């Protein structure tokens, strides 16, 4: 529901989970989360994205190309959705300096990866302006895929809140990698954030 005043509102963008092969942005179990933020004065945007793992086998340390492609597609779609909000921020009454991204499982991987790639000016970051950065990240059981070991940021990441169960069998709580290539989960990222005094 849009605020009828002219006051600009912070925005929460949410990316659903489902292993990059299923899920829906309007699933009933997400509605309380959306409503919580809407009542706090946020414009809530539930993002849809291409499901790149449909028809693919589960990723392994030696065969993760389909997963890498799926993450890239999701990040690209999140960037495109963000660009739309930036373009129409006036009409939507969104404060573009207060756009927070949040996601669950595959969605959490997407939002963490998106902020990581944006802060590092990676090739995927051609959709959004160089001057734009997300204001915050809320991750429910996410991680970052890296080919260079534990992810390092050229620009400090957005303030990030991690939620992750240590018994997670799908998204690694710590990390799952072969040599330096693999998925770095919430525990390893949180330790890195603490070491580097990231927010």
Please give the residue ranges for each predicted region.
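Short beta-strand element of the alpha/beta-hydrolase
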Residues: 8-19
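Hydrophobic beta-strand anchors of alpha/beta hydrolase catalytic cores
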Residues: 12-14, 44, 160
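Serine-hydrolase catalytic-loop signature spanning alpha/beta hydrolases and amidase-signature enzymes
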Residues: 19-22, 44, 84
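Short amphipathic alpha-helix adjacent to the substrate-entry channel of hydrolases
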Residues: 25-47, 54
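Primarily recognizes the serine-hydrolase "nucleophile elbow" in alpha/beta-hydrolase
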Residues: 83-156
């Amino acid at each position: 529901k849009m605020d009828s005043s002219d006051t600009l509102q912070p925005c929460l963008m949410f990316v659903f989970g489902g292993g990059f092969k299923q899920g829906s942005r309007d699933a009933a179990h997400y509605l309380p989360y959306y409503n919580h933020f809407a009542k706090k004065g946020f414009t809530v945007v539930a993002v849809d994205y291409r499901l790149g793992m449909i028809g693919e086998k589960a990723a392994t340390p030696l065969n993760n190309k389909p997963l890498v492609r799926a993450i890239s597609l999701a990040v690209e779609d999140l960037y495109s959705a963000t660009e739309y909000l930036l373009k129409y921020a006036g009409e939507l009454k969104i404060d573009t300096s207060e756009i927070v991204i949040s996601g669950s499982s595959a969605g959490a991987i997407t939002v963490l990866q998106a902020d990581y790639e944006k802060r590092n000016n990676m090739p995927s970051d051609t959709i959004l302006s160089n001057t734009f950065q997300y204001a915050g990240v809320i991750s429910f059981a996410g991680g970052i895929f890296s080919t260079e070991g534990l992810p390092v940021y050229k620009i400090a990441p957005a303030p990030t809140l991690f939620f992750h169960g240590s018994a997670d069998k799908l998204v690694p709580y710590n990390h799952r990698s072969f040599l330096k290539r693999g998925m770095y989960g919430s525990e390893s990222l949180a330790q890195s954030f603490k070491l580097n005094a990231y927010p």
